[in-house]
Each structure stands twice: as C-alpha cells, then as structure tokens.
C-alpha cells in the first residue's frame, strides 16, 4: 500500500534541489518504503516513487534519499518536471546542497524543442548534454535536427555549442563550428527548397540556406540549377541585433549565372549578355537617440534577370530602387539625409546626390496661430537610359506656413492657411543646354473647413454581431490658391515631375513634391466622409463601413484635365469576420464616364476555405479579373487556385491549380501547375514544387 512521508522532517531535507536553494516542504511517496540495514540507513521508495515540491515533481521506479548528503538517487523510468520542462532518464542523481544533478540516457523537452543525450549534468541555471541531439518538434525523420558532442542549455534562455551538425532527421550534412540560439529570438536557421519545370528554364531546382555564425548573424547561399540555362549561385546573409532591443536588421541576396539559354532582349530592346547577376541588400536600424536608418540596394545586370530566375520577387516590385535614408528627430522636427542612386542602366531614376531636408512640425504660436515649415537642399540628376537629354539641377527650397484653427462649436471647424515657398535652381542642365539660375517665390492662400455630424441608432442583430450603430458624417471643403507657380517652367529641368496616380494629389503647396513641374493652382476640393461603427466587446468599437467621396473644382485658368476632372470614391466594409469588401472608383465629370474601377471581395469560413474576387479597370488601358481560392480538404491538406482573366484580350493570363500540405508540422510543401497566356518571357506551362519552413 502506498506510503507517504510529508517532509515536515526538514532535518532530512531542506528544499528541492533543482528548484530552489531555500528550504521548502516536499512530499515523498511510493508503493513500498525500505528502512532496513540493506539500505545503509537511507530512505528507499520503490514502485511509483515520487518526490513533489512546490514547483517540481520527480518520479521513478525507485528513489533513494541519502540523508547524510541530502542527495536523491532515482532510477528506472525517471521523470522530472520543472518550470514547464520535462526530463526523462534511466538514472538521475540530485544533490540538494549545491543543486547539481547527473543523469544518463536523457530525454527532455520544452516545446517546441526536444532533446536526447547519453549523459546530462548541471544545475538549474545551466545544463550540459553529452552526445546530444536536439530537434524542432518531436523527434522524427522530417524534423530539423542538430547533433553535438556537447551542448549547453540555459533553461529559459538559449543553447550554445562549440561544434555541431545540422540537418533533417538522421541526414545532417551541415557542419557548424559553433552555434548559439536565444529562445526569445527567431531560429537563426533559414532553409528553403524549390523545383519544377518551365520551358524557358527547363527542369530546375533551387535551394537557400542560412546558418548561424554568431548571435544575430546567419550566413549561407542560394543555388539554382536550370537545365536550359545553367547554374546560378551566390552568397546570402541575414543579420539582426542579438539583444532584445532589435535595433537593427538586414538581409543580403545575390546570384550569378553564365546563361547559355535563350536570353532574348531587355526592356530597351538590347541583347542580353550571357554573364548575368543580381544583388539585393536591405538594412533597417534604430538608434537609442531615435535616429532611423533605412538602406536598400538593388543591382541587376539586366532588366530581366530577376524576372527570369526569381519571378516571385519580381512581380510585386518591377522597378528596383536603391537609396540610403537617415532621419533624426529633434524638438518637434526632423532632419533627414537621403541619397538615391542609379546602379542600373535600364530604368529612369531621379537621383539625389544627396538631399538634406529639415522639417519643422506644426508648432503653436500666440493667439492660436500655428506654424510649420521645411527647408531642403538637393543635388538632382537624371540620365534617361532610353535616350534623351541628361538633366541636372542643384535646388535650394524653403516653405513656411501659418494657420489659425477656429472651432466655435464641436461640430464645425475652419482653418485659414497662409504660406510661401522660395525655390532656387542652380547649375541647370538639359542635354547641351545650360539655362541660367532660376529663383521662384510663390505665395499660398487657402482654408480647410469641416462639419462633424453624428447620429446613433438602437439597432441590434446577433447574426451580424451589431450592438447599436453610430454614423459619423463629415463634409469637407478645402481651397488653395498659389498663382505664378508655372514661372520658369520652360527653363527648369523637369526632374521632380508629376507622376500618374489613381488618387487625388496633395492640394497644398507644402505637400506638393513635384517642385520642378508646378502649375498655377486655384482649386476647391469638396469631400464627404462617412463612417459607420458598432460596439465590440473585444475592441470597444468596430468599423462596419467607410465611404469617402472627393473631387476637385478648378477656378481661374482652365487646367488641361478640365475644371472638374473626376469624382473619387473609396469604399471599405467589414460587417462580419467572413466578409470584406473594398472598392475604388474614379468617375470622370467631362462626359467620359467611368475612368477607373477597382474592387476586391473576400469570403471566408474560418480556416476551412476562403475566396477573393477582384478586378482592375482603367479606361483604355486594362480590364482584368482575378480569383484567389483556398479550401481545406482535410487536416494538413489544402487546395489552392489563382485565375486571372484579361477581358480586353479575352484570355486567361494565368491559371494556377495546386495543393499545399504540411509535413511533420514543420514543412509546408506546395505543388502547383500553371498555364500562362500573353507573357513574352515566361513559358506557357509551368510546374512548381516548393518546400518552406513553417516554424523557423
């Protein structure tokens, strides 16, 4: 029959050895208790033997307590549970006086990490494993695994080793001279595999691996083998601040190939050379003083190298950018240094070599007046790769404005604005032309007015989870007038020029960025904002619908786009977790009708399935429709599809069908078949197989 000995007998034991050094009551129990001479006067519990303390539990087939040394000896199916970690062993010795232990044939885990070892020893603060093997997730043939002759575990903090082998299951081909990992940081190992077939590439296989070299630094490489093109290889890296502050991080990716396939021509119609390569570097940093640093470098040997070999990275951003920006906050201000480079010779880039800018944020003065300002110096260059005159200018610019908000009631506000902008262009160059220096002084006058109306409605619907409605209605009217802005327009090189945008441009002179392409402006902007909200038990307030309308009315000289160009409408609604709708509409007021219409509708049922339908319409430019779907067929297996239809050309530009499934809760395997139409460089058929890590 089980016997228990509550350890009020503190003369024998003062505390559990691993959990704490201070005395604490523990309890021993077992099926039988042996106090005979054969035990040397020691307490021996056999059969379901247990030691239970405040924050630990030890069980085994047999537990022996040596009173003279305050030592537990456990053997046979030993299990020690401590602070969320669990250790199993064939034998374990626990010395209470110094908190040290030794064990053999050890298995231990603290999710998601599990380890085995021939021997283990240490204390509560540090455990040394000999003949160790650590896996991410429960040990198995597909789990990421690290094996080491000796491994040091710092419970709750991390692990370190002087030498180890890394791989998957029993296949561990990667040797590490030394490794360290803090549990509060992402795993410093990055693995990715891919493969498939495309007519333009042939059969191909791709791999990327980053291994830890020191805390916060992973080095490795990228390898791509293409039967129709050759071998692309290059170094890769990822780095981050090893401290908990996470003050800086960055990535490096590269590749070089001697391309023996059909390379076709580049963006400018020029033949592509066989030696092809790319380099991408990104860096983000934040100092203790609040200074932020952002840098990005994208070098391509030709305009198509990323599209040919890494299309997933190409299609989201098809024009590379390279810059370094340093922003330092001051008292209600920012000082910014920006340099923008043109390392490639196939895209037009407005270079800044460099630009230094000071922004004074709105600051109150006397009588309720607010001031704001900015000043900058920029050395601008543009060398069009497709031909045309080389443009250059050194520009000194300053802007200052005063405003006086006036809100006689909570529902009405009126803010007059008065400002001025001084711009000096020097060292002008437009091809062989050398226009003289240009000095331009502009004045700005205007106002911003708004009405704020609201209403509440006692509406409840448990299906849509609506608990009352609040409608916020905000009519807005703004006006800006800055005459003479086109002065010197024919002499100033148009480097910072107006770009195409589907949204309304900034109205004020202080927000305008195309300083080399200004026009005289006298414009009213009329807007109407609608917001519908309901109570939410988790978030307090949940937004059900947002509908904004706005349009510009030009007075004075008629602009090229007309006095009332278009009405812009934006709609977003999320009335329920399973429904989302977003829309953007631009309606021309000149009798041309609909100019642009973009929508997106998403339906989902938890994690069982989701479907998104969207369209993009731009008059005389494009009209396409896209469907993205996902459905869970069973646990760990999903069906995915993407369809893109071009209504103007009456064809499917893309049809993709695939399956995604998890392996050992660690790897995501995605296989897909794609059929393309209309693309000039990609094959009409493609098969892809990708293996990505789910948990590291």
Listing of model-derived features with the role each one plays in the protein:
Residues 1-4:
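Positively charged n-region of N-terminal signal peptides that target proteins for export
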Residues 6-16:
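Bacterial N-terminal signal peptides
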Residues 17-23, 680:
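Boundary at the C-terminal end of the N-terminal hydrophobic targeting segment
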Residues 24, 39, 43, 185-187, ...:
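A short, polar/charged loop/turn motif at coil->beta-strand junctions and beta-hairpin connectors
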Residues 27, 34-59, 64-75, 79-81, ...:
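Structural recognition of beta-strand segments within beta-rich domains
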């Amino acid at each position: 029959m089980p016997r228990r000995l509550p350890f009020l007998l503190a003369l024998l034991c003062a505390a559990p050895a691993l959990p704490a050094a201070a005395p604490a009551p523990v309890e021993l129990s077992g099926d039988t208790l042996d106090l005979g001479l054969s035990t040397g006067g020691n307490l021996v519990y056999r059969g379901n033997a247990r030691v239970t303390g405040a924050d630990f539990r030890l069980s085994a087939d047999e537990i022996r307590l040596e009173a003279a040394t305050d030592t537990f000896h456990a053997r046979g199916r030993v299990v020690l549970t401590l602070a969320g970690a669990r250790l199993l062993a064939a034998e374990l010795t626990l010395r209470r006086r110094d908190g040290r232990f030794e064990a053999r044939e050890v298995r231990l885990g603290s999710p998601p990490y599990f380890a085995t070892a021939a021997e283990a020893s240490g204390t509560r603060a540090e455990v040394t494993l000999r003949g160790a093997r650590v896996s991410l997730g429960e040990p198995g043939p597909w789990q990421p695994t690290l094996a080491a002759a000796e491994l040091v575990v710092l419970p709750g903090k991390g692990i370190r080793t002087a030498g180890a082998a890394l791989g998957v299951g029993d296949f561990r081909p990667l040797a590490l001279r030394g490794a360290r990992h803090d549990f509060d940081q992402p795993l410093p190992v990055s693995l990715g595999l891919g493969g498939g077939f495309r007519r333009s590439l042939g059969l191909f296989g791709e791999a990327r691996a980053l291994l830890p070299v020191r805390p916060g630094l992973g080095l490795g490489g990228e390898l791509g083998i293409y039967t129709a093109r050759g071998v692309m290889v290059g170094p890769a890296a990822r780095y981050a601040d090893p401290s908990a502050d996470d003050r800086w991080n960055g990535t490096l990716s590269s590749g070089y190939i001697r391309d023996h396939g059909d390379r076709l021509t580049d963006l400018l119609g020029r033949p592509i050379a066989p030696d092809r390569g790319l380099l991408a570097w990104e860096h983000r940093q934040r100092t203790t003083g609040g200074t932020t640093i952002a840098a990005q470098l994208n070098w391509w040997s030709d305009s198509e190298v990323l599209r040919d070999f890494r299309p997933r990275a190409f299609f989201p951003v098809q024009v590379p950018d390279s810059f370094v920006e340093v922003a330092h906050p001051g008292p209600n201000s920012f000082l910014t240094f920006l340099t923008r480079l043109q390392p490639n010779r196939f895209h037009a880039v407005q270079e800044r070599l460099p630009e230094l800018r000071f922004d004074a944020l709105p600051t109150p003065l006397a009588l309720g007046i607010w001031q704001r300002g900015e000043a900058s110096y920029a050395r601008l260059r543009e060398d069009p790769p497709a031909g045309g005159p080389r443009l250059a200018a050194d520009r000194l610019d300053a802007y200052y404005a005063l405003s006086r908000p006036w809100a006689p009631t909570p529902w009405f506000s009126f803010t007059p604005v008065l400002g001025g902008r001084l711009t000096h262009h020097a060292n002008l160059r437009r091809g062989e032309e050398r226009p003289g220096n240009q000095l331009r002084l502009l004045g700005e006058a205007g106002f911003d007015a708004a009405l704020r109306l609201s209403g509440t409605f006692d509406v409840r619907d448990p299906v849509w989870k609506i608990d009352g409605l609040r409608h916020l209605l905000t009519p807005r009217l703004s006006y800006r007038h800055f005459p003479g802005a086109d002065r010197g327009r024919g002499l100033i090189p148009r480097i910072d020029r107006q770009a195409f945008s589907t949204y309304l441009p900034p109205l004020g002179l202080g927000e305008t960025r195309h300083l080399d392409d200004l026009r005289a402006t006298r414009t009213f902007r009329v807007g109407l904002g609608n917001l519908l909200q309901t109570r939410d038990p988790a978030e307090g307030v949940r937004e059900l619908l947002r509908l904004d309308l706005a349009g510009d009315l030009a007075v004075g000289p008629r602009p090229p786009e007309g006095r009332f160009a278009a009405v812009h409408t934006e709609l977003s609604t999320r009335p329920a977790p399973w429904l989302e709708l977003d829309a953007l509409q631009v309606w021309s007021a000149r009798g041309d009708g609909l100019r642009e219409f973009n929508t997106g509708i998403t339906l989902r049922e938890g994690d069982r399935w989701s479907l998104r339908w969207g369209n993009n319409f731009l008059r005389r430019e494009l009209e396409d429709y896209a469907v993205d779907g996902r459905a869970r067929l069973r646990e760990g297996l999903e069906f995915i599809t993407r369809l893109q239809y071009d209504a103007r050309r009456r064809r499917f530009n893309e049809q993709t069908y695939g399956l995604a499934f998890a392996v050992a809760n660690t790897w995501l395997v995605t296989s897909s078949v794609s059929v393309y139409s209309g693309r000039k460089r990609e094959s009409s058929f493609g098969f892809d197989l990708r293996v990505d890590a789910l948990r590291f």
